[in-house]
Amino acid sequence: MKSQNSKEQKSDFSYKETLNLLKTDFSMRANSVVREPEIQNFWAKNNIDFKLGSNNSGEIFTLHDGPPYANGALHMGHALNKVLKDIINKYKTLRGFRVHYVPGWDCHGLPIELKVLQNLKSDERKNLDTLNLRKKATDYAHIQINNQMEGFKRWGIWGDWDNPYLTLKKSYESAQIGVFGKMFLNGYIYRGLKPVHWSPSSRTALAEAELEYPDEHYSKSIYISLKITKISEEILLNFVQENLNIKREFFENNSFITIWTTTPWTIPANEAVAVNPKIKYVFAIDEEKRIYLFAKDLSTEISNKFNKDLKVLLEVKGSQLENIEYQHPSKNKNCRIVIGGDYITTESGTGIVHTAPGHGVDDFNVGQKYDLPITCVVDEKGNLNEYSGQFQGSNVLKDANDLIIEYLKGNNLLLLQENYKHRYPYDWRTKKPTIFRATEQWFASVNGFRSSALQAIEDVEWMPATGKKRIYSMVVGRGDWCISRQRSWGVPIPVFYKKNGNDILLNSEIINHIQELFSEHGADIWWDWDVKNLLPEKYARESDLWKKGTDTMDVWFDSGSSWAAVCELRSELKYPADLYLEGSDQHRGWFQSSLLTSVAVNNKPPYKKVLTHGFALDENGRKMSKSLGNVVDPNIIINGGNNKKTEPAYGADVLRLWVSSVDYSVDVPIGSNILKQLADVYRKVRNTARYLLGNIHDYDPNIDSYEIDQLPLLDQWMLGRLVEVTDQISNAYENYEFSKFFQILQSFCVVDLSNFYLDIAKDRLYVSSKSQFRRRSCQFVMSKVVENLAVLISPVLCHMAEDIWQNIPYLTKEKSVFQRGWPIFAQSWKNQILNEHIANLRNLRVEINKAIEGCRNKQIIGAALETEVNYLPEDKVVKDSLIWLQEFGSQDVDLFRDWLIVSNFQVVSDLVENSLIIDNNALGKIQIIKAQGQKCDRCWHYQKETFNGIQNTKLCKRCSNIINLEFT
């Protein structure tokens, strides 16, 4: 019977057992250290891995892996790179593409060779032959590969781990010989004496990509004077005409060329000085009656540097200075002025360039034009040799500069010495300076196919677009590529040299034969077998005339041949590949070496699209280094550090979420504060999924499924929003804009679900009768949301997605989320008119919630259900949406009162008295008042009419009916 609104004793009885409470095994805490490996074991047992993509029936999609170097622990750069690739591959797999991802490793080169040598005792090193070194290097590389592979797997990376490509494999080495051979036969590879970047610390030539340029390099720069010994008659006549008071003989006997250099050790190799024909030069006299030649535009700077008062006697064009002769600074011979190019400027120095053709590229080029000697004064260790005269035995990185400077000072040739800060190339492995040194090397002549390479760059899509300009400018300006190295751990250049003479033996028969041998036996036979066994049978008789070459190929030629050794050879892949994805430094590395070899052999690029990412920095934007103590270790992110409070175990999915959250086109920060924020986002997504799963524990889609038009408006909107979010996330994945995925996911889980739909749904889910339509329709929607949410997040949060899927309480057709395929929805789920109305009503809801929160902050109320809302509209759009809701909405679900989670809502023409708060805003007046009636002890709504419940409790009519029907 109806109760009277009289004060009665409060009951301690709880209706909790009568509510449909959340029930799921999907835990609030991820416990990733345990749960993620369990999920990976589930994948392994059920072949839920890269094979899913391989078995798809769609178009082949090939993301070709740029091989990391097989040395050292994994770092954040690896994480950024590999997770980006995995996100793309998983998305393409879900889209039905045939995806077969083949991870690779770069295995040859100096770092591994040095590691092997460092691990040996000195006597072992002395007795180590090349074959044993190569065996130890192979073993070391395999250990490193296995360590890195286990790390990649723990990150949730899918790939053909049983068949990766390794540059040390026989099949790879054979294919690489094939690339070299075709380039040689096409006329693009030659042997010549040329200055190359040489590392005295590594004792080998280096490619441009093996250099780095530290910011704090200082060179000992010097200005020196060179005594002029012969001047052209034209200049002499001009001088006499303009300087009547100075005798011709005085000008001839007291004139000096001024030059500036940052490499004093190259002075013994001087063969000329070069001028720019377009620059104006002057002869200027000082107070000591010495006449100096230098660029006119540098007059003031030189006068200040030398602390001399210089008076200009004669101005000449650079072109007039050709063939003026001068006394070599350290040798008993005359040299001359030659005409150089635009590399000679007036930005620094004197405008006259010391030219040593054996120790500089520009010097070499001008030397070729004038047939100058290519004098190399340095040996492989950086020691000055016999061609340096009295400086023999000194070292370019140690004492040579000081000895030569002292010599110049003693002979009154040194004008000034100063330290000069500039960019200077260092060996990227030993971190020591390099030099230019002319040696006999093997080169790829880029000039032969430069125009084709530039056209290939135009044909490729570069992301970001700035990458195209960057690699284009590099290829336009690059010289020939030095591909030979003087080391043992690499693929040999398959050439034979005549023992007596300069002839070489290298042709199609040799190349094909070596390629076949390497395919069967591997490259070690180059050092193991004698010449007779390496040569084709027709050359066996003359084998005694030949010796094997000892050079190996540049490791960039190794990795740059991967399109031939992997994409071309494996039927499950395609060439050109759809995508190359690496750090932005690879424009000068792997992107370029792959492009050059592919164009030289097949006249096409090896890729259709190139995507680049930046570098991982600390939270303050600094480069990570052990010395700064700011290195973020991906292993610690996943498993935690020694102190779990300061370094908690976040798991692989938080690492993956970081990758999706950043604008990877630029350098990206990572650190403890960022990880905390990401972990918070991860928890919100996880808790949203848990709420969805927990509230469909008794739902059966085979019984309670509905057409869209059977559902309440709120449910129709939610499904329409799911379609919109799916479209947005699909576009983000398609365009590789993963940070948009991150933003959309956050907004969907927090704003659309937690703060709106699921907040409103609590009453429907908990309080309704189990099988009531208002509850089942909500469960239907939630089942659609949770299933598709799992798929949408699976490329990024792969472990959480699978965990969600395994906790769906009803039977699904697919065993794994990755077998589901990408969501496809009926277009009828989209409803623009409905969206507009609900957007208007959500705006009103936000304003009303602010007013209610104001009451709560004043401690006038606790829950929103303790209030009623009166709304006096001033916004016609919102008013129309309220009328629409009243006309078309479900009385069980779409009452705006229930959307607000208040006990009553009315549109009024006048406000009443006794307000808790009145808020005026653009939408109208919002009045919050105390809820009338009594609180229902089950649903907590306030009703004017209540009924007696169990043990002196009060129930609203709805709850009273449910209790009477289901629990009595």
From Swiss-Prot:
Transmembrane segments annotated in the record for this chain: none
Subunit structure: Monomer.
Protein name: Isoleucine--tRNA ligase
Free-text comment on this protein's domains from its UniProt entry: IleRS has two distinct active sites: one for aminoacylation and one for editing. The misactivated valine is translocated from the active site to the editing site, which sterically excludes the correctly activated isoleucine. The single editing site contains two valyl binding pockets, one specific for each substrate (Val-AMP or Val-tRNA(Ile)).
Taxonomic superkingdom: Bacteria
Motif placement: 'KMSKS' region: 623-627
GO CC annotations on file: cytoplasm
Keyword NADP assigned: no
CDD domains the UniProt entry points to: Anticodon_Ia_Ile_BEm, IleRS_core
Residue span of motif 'HIGH' region: 68-78
Binding site for Zn(2+): C936, C939, C956, C959
InterPro entries attached to this UniProt entry: aa-tRNA-synth_I_CS (IPR001412), aa-tRNA-synth_Ia (IPR002300), Anticodon_Ile_BEm (IPR033708), Ile-tRNA-ligase (IPR002301), Ile-tRNA-ligase_type1 (IPR023585), Ile-tRNA_ligase (IPR050081), M/V/L/I-tRNA-synth_anticd-bd (IPR013155), Rossmann-like_a/b/a_fold (IPR014729)
Entry note: cofactor: Binds 1 zinc ion per subunit.
Cofactor(s) listed in the protein's UniProt record: Zn(2+)
Annotated HAMAP family: Ile_tRNA_synth_type1
List of residues binding L-isoleucyl-5'-AMP: E582
Protein species of origin: Prochlorococcus marinus (strain AS9601)
PANTHER family named among the record's database cross-references: ISOLEUCINE--TRNA LIGASE, MITOCHONDRIAL (PTHR42765:SF1), SOLEUCYL-TRNA SYNTHETASE (PTHR42765)
Catalytic activity line of the entry: tRNA(Ile) + L-isoleucine + ATP = L-isoleucyl-tRNA(Ile) + AMP + diphosphate
GO BP of this protein: isoleucyl-tRNA aminoacylation
Protein residues bound to ATP: K626
Family matches, as Pfam families: Anticodon_1, tRNA-synt_1, zf-FPG_IleRS
